[in-house]
A protein has these predicted regions:
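Hydrophobic ligand-binding cavity/cleft-lining segments
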Residues: 37-100, 188
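A mature extracytoplasmic/lumenal domain signature
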Residues: 77-79, 87-89, 99, 107-111, ...
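Beta-strand/loop substructures that line and gate deep hydrophobic ligand-binding cavities in soluble
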Residues: 137-184
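Short, hydrophobic-biased amphipathic alpha-helical segments
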Residues: 181-193
Length: 203
């Protein structure tokens, strides 16, 4: 006879599923090892992160500034095949097609909670223009809709960065859990990116 899952186990699984939205965003996003320590050590101001939900669709907007030049920021954000190195929950990120200003990037990410593991699959059509990277999922396997953009604009001696994501998960998650985790994990993702921006600029 198969034992039924306890309320704690079911809640844990919902929390695990909720973490996936940010874990896979080139974006976006991310339960990253060491991110909490980086946030403590990083004196940079906390990013402005807004999460909204409407009829099962979640919209995330994040804004932050970094001292690096836009060219450095965009070089990191568009280094698709190296994403697993600085965003470890993204297990694979492979460029399947490449044309001027357009790419197709296939990504897989894994989120774990205790003995439970969930894999997310994306096939992103990416369009690059001056200062902006837009992406949309074309496979619909893990999300019924998933699209967003990064923008990097020169500001003073650094760069103002904006991240936007609109996603509708293909799994059930309580709204209050997902909104809270999206906001927290977006902040962790940004801290990880800040570290990578600084490392690239120092080369």
């Amino acid at each position: 006879m198969r034992a039924s899952s306890s309320p704690q186990t079911r809640d844990g699984r919902r929390r695990c599923a909720a973490r996936l939205l940010v874990a896979v965003a080139v974006c976006v996003s991310v339960a990253l090892p060491g991110a909490r320590a980086a946030a403590i050590a990083d004196p940079a101001p906390s990013p402005e992160v807004l999460v909204r939900e409407e009829r099962g669709t979640y919209r995330v907007t994040a804004r932050f500034e970094v001292p690096e030049a836009p060219a450095v920021v965009l070089a990191v954000l568009s280094d698709y095949e190296q994403i697993p190195r600085f965003m470890p929950d993204v297990r694979t990120s492979v460029v399947r097609e490449r044309a001027p200003g357009r790419l197709v990037v296939e990504q897989e990410a894994v989120s774990k909670f205790m003995m439970f593991s969930k894999q997310v699959h994306l096939v992103l059509e990416v369009n690059e223009s001056e200062g902006t990277i837009r992406f949309v999922d074309r496979c619909g396997k893990s999300f019924t809709s998933y699209q967003g953009a990064w923008s990097a604009v020169s500001k003073g001696n650094g760069t103002a960065v904006t991240y936007e994501l609109t996603a509708r998960p293909a799994f059930d998650v309580p709204e209050f859990i997902l909104k809270r985790l999206l906001k927290r994990d977006s902040g962790q993702m940004i801290n990880r990116l800040r570290s990578e921006f600084a490392a690239r600029a120092a080369r």
